[in-house]
């Protein structure tokens, strides 16, 4: 449906924004932080947030695909 497709597009857009935030945050972290433990901690947090965003995008794409195949 059009509404579902619009929502999937919105989720994909948000995931692209999350990618940019991840890159920007990692750059800032590595250029401003001097404590290795803090860098490792934040890097792990950022990595898991990025994986969450990727997983949300994947779920949206799968749901859209299932709906399209069954309509």
Language-model regions, residue ranges each:
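Cytosolic, long alpha-helical scaffolding segments
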Residues: 1-71
